[in-house]
């Protein structure tokens, strides 16, 4: 179980209250698929992922990026029990989709990069620390079924 300070809770809540899901989600997933091309194998049904331009312009990638980012809402709303909040998604990704659990960390890094670019100077070291702690808890929860 993750221990959260009041300040960390406030930072996470503030990030999500200002989150531009329609911008950050597609950019983060696109970045992950471009920077780590082996992650594309899980998205073969998404159509043309031939190059960066195709990935960035792919409506299926954009829609899934938004869905993934909204999936983080579950963790934000259940910060005291993140592991249990993601049990069903962990099972889906491990047993049905067979996603390499390392991919969750890669995507979380891409989300952090895109969020930092969007927030600019407001993305302080303290903000980054709280956000990465949150994402690490989500990544761990999503990988729970693999252990």
UniProtKB/Swiss-Prot annotation:
Signal peptide (from-to): none
InterPro entries (alphabetical): Globin, Globin-like_sf, Globin/Proto, Hemoglobin_b, Hemoglobin_oxygen_transport
Pfam families per UniProt: Globin
Positions that bind heme b: 64, 93
Matching Gene3D superfamilies: Globins
Distribution of this protein across tissues and organs: Red blood cells.
Domain Globin: 3-147
Keywords, ordered alphabetically: Heme, Iron, Metal-binding, Oxygen transport, Transport
Molecular function, one GO term: haptoglobin binding
GO biological process, one term: hydrogen peroxide catabolic process
One CC-aspect GO term: hemoglobin complex
Superkingdom in the source lineage: Eukaryota
Subunit structure as annotated in this protein's UniProt entry: Heterotetramer of two alpha chains and two beta chains.
Role noted for this protein: Involved in oxygen transport from gills to the various peripheral tissues.
Similarity comment: family membership: Belongs to the globin family.
Name of the protein described by the UniProt record: Hemoglobin subunit beta
Organism per entry: Trematomus newnesi (Dusky notothen)
């Amino acid at each position: 179980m993750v221990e959260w300070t009041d300040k960390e809770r406030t930072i996470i809540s503030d990030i999500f209250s200002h989150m531009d899901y329609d911008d950050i989600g597609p950019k983060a997933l696109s970045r992950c698929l471009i920077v780590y091309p082996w992650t594309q194998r899980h998205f073969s049904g998404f159509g043309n992922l031939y190059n960066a331009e195709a990935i960035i312009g792919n409506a299926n990638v954009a829609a899934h990026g938004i869905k993934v980012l909204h999936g983080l809402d579950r963790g934000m709303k259940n910060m005291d029990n993140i592991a249990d909040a993601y049990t069903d998604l962990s099972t889906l990704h491990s047993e049905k989709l067979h996603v390499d659990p390392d991919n969750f960390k890669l995507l979380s890094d891409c989300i952090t990069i895109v969020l930092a670019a969007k927030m600019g100077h407001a993305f302080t070291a303290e903000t980054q620390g709280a956000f990465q702690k949150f994402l690490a808890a989500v990544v761990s929860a999503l990988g729970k079924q693999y252990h």
